[in-house]
Amino acid sequence: MADTHPLVTVETIVLVGLGGFAGSNLRYFVGLFFPGLQGTLLVNVCGSFALGVLVYEGLQVGALASETKLAASTGFISSFTTYSTFAVETVLTPEWAVANVVGSYALGFAGVLVGREVVRLFAGGGQ
C-alpha cells in the first residue's frame, strides 16, 4: 500500500463530503416534487444510470480522475440514492410491494445498461 500525503487524504474526504452534501440535497428536492414510491424509484434509477456511466467510463475511457469518480460515486450517488427508503416504502405499501421490488430492480439494471451504452456511444463504439 502506497503512502498517501495527509493533505491528499483530507482533500479526498472533503470531495466525498461535498458530493454527499449535493446528493442528499438533490434527493430531498426530488422528494418534494415526487413524494413516496415515485421519488424513490426516480432517484434510484437515475443513480443506477449515473453509476453505470461512471463504472463503464472507467473501464472503457478512463478520462476521469480517481478523486472525481470517488466524489461522484461514494459522495454524490450514494447519498442521492436510497435503498433503506426503498425497503421501508415497500413494506409500508403491501399492495405495491411486488411491483415496487420487480420494477425497481428491473429499472435499476436497465439504468446501468443504458449508462453503459451511453459511454460506448460517446467513446466511439468501444467494447
From Swiss-Prot:
Signal peptide: none annotated. Keywords: Cell membrane, Ion channel, Ion transport, Membrane, Transmembrane, Transmembrane helix, Transport. It is found in: Cell membrane. It is a multi-pass membrane protein. It holds the Pfam family CRCB. GO terms for molecular function: fluoride channel activity. One of its GO terms (biological process) is cellular detoxification of fluoride. It comes from the Archaea. The chain crosses the membrane at residues 6-26, 29-49, 95-115. One of its GO terms (cellular component) is plasma membrane. InterPro entries: FluC. It catalyses: fluoride(in) = fluoride(out). Fluoride-specific ion channel. Important for reducing fluoride concentration in the cell, thus reducing its toxicity. This is Fluoride-specific ion channel FluC 1. It comes from Haloarcula marismortui (strain ATCC 43049 / DSM 3752 / JCM 8966 / VKM B-1809). The gene is fluC1.
